Amino acid sequence: MKFLDQEKRRQLLNERHSCKMFDSHYEFSSTELEEIAEIARLSPSSYNTQPWHFVMVTDKDLKKQIAAHSYFNEEMIKSASALMVVCSLRPSELLPHGHYMQNLYPESYKVRVIPSFAQMLGVRFNHSMQRLESYILEQCYIAVGQICMGVSLMGLDSCIIGGFDPLKVGEVLEERINKPKIACLIALGKRVAEASQKSRKSKVDAITWL
């Protein structure tokens, strides 16, 4: 297995940015779309619960309909080559003895994980569905981070979008997906302009070494 050297890693980390406008003429190849989908599928999650479903939108008309409910992100979404809709599972779907959890793991893994997960729901969340919902969203955002970094490694660009009306976007998608619960959107494509200089806290302000 080959790894990038330190200089290349740092370069990629600095070049990754939230792209605000994409090349509207750029079209993903089927290979690129499959690779992005696989990056998403392989994302890590607590207890390997994978409490998500990813919807890849490449249809221009459908993108336009979703963009209409994304406030100030409309033009950016319309310019993107694809839009990934990150849907979260509902808390009821993650209950230990429910259909989803009982069919998620191989049997040898399930007998170890399910009791531990059930205990965690009691000890950490006090069986609160609201806390479980927050936990599910946390897992989705872990996947979002992996997707955006993975896309950058492909030489492509992304922008995480939280500014949208989830109910309206859900209505657009409902004809194709059964009652989606949307965590966030990710616009994907190729930048049209170079990124501005990255602005971050200094190491002193961002990191404490103990």
UniProtKB/Swiss-Prot annotation:
SUPFAM superfamilies: FMN-dependent nitroreductase-like. CDD domains: NfsB-like (cd02149). Changing C19Y: Loss of function and acquisition of resistance to metronidazole. Changing A183V: In strain: ATCC 49503 / 60190. GO terms for molecular function: oxidoreductase activity. Its EC number is 1.-.-.-. Changing H97T: In strain: 69A. InterPro entries: NfsB-like (IPR033878), Nitroreductase (IPR029479), Nitroreductase-like (IPR000415). Keywords: Antibiotic resistance, NADP, Oxidoreductase. NADP(+) binds at G150, V151, S152, L153, M154, G155. It is an enzyme of class 1 (oxidoreductase). One of its GO terms (biological process) is response to antibiotic. It holds the Pfam family Nitroreductase. Belongs to the nitroreductase family. Reduction of a variety of nitroaromatic compounds using NADPH as source of reducing equivalents; two electrons are transferred. Capable of reducing metronidazole; inactive RdxA renders the bacterium resistant to this compound. The reduction of metronidazole generates hydroxylamine, a potent mutagen and bactericide. This is Oxygen-insensitive NADPH nitroreductase.
